[in-house]
């Protein structure tokens, strides 16, 4: 693949050795996003991170993902959101604890099924794969995405409140929120620097 992206999902939260996710991403220099439940499995301040999928400004995230030539699902559990909703025609390589639950519209081109820590440990033995992503492409997407999440206004808005709370909470501060439309803005906008601090 010349332009792969990785999507981290909730099954990754069960990993015995979750730092392997970062090793895999950094070794191969793959841009990554996450589902809501997997936020922070890799620090979302990482320069390769393009944020949360299928929440606020989902169409922007879908367009970015569909510009890739391969999606690598890393522990992506379709209980959160089905691949069919966002993957488009981009081929899928699934690395998960079970076979992906997909219909024939998803182009599954490869599958690694089993313990995620073991699977990634074995994949890390191989030489790094090169790709054609540039940091400026990712930076441009992230800038546009974050600006779209925070439209210009004089009013005190939910996105301003979220930014204030993020600023005053410590790095390991935990935010919890209930179901509802506000989850889309929070999940997209809140930066999780580590696992299990955003739920």
Q: Model-found features: residue ranges?
A:
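Short glycine-rich anion-binding loops that position phosphate/pyrophosphate groups of nucleotides
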Residues: 10-13, 37-38, 76-79, 180-182
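Glycine-rich phosphate/diphosphate-binding loops that line cofactor/substrate pockets in enzymes
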Residues: 1-4, 24, 65-68, 164-171
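Glycine-rich, acidic loop regions that bind phosphate or pyrophosphate groups
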Residues: 38-137
């Amino acid at each position: 693949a010349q332009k792969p992206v990785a999507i981290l999902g909730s099954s990754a939260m069960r990993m015995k050795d979750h730092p392997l996710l970062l090793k895999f991403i950094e070794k191969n220099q793959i841009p990554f996003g996450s589902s809501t439940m997997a936020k922070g499995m890799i620090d979302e301040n990482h320069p390769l991170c393009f944020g949360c999928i299928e929440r606020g400004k989902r169409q922007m995230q879908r367009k970015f993902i569909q510009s890739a030539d391969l999606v690598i699902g890393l522990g992506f559990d379709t209980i959160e959101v089905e691949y069919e909703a966002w993957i488009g025609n981009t081929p899928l390589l699934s690395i998960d604890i079970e076979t992906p639950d997909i219909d024939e519209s998803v182009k599954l081109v490869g599958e690694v099924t089993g313990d995620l820590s073991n699977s990634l440990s074995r994949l890390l033995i191989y030489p790094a794969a090169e790709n054609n992503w540039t940091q400026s492409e990712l930076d441009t997407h992230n800038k546009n995405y974050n600006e779209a999440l925070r439209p210009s206004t004089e009013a005190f808005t939910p996105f301003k409140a979220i930014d204030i709370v993020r600023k005053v909470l410590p790095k390991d501060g935990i935010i919890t929120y209930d179901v509802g439309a506000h989850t889309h803005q929070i999940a997209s906008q809140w930066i999780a620097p580590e696992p299990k601090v955003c739920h």
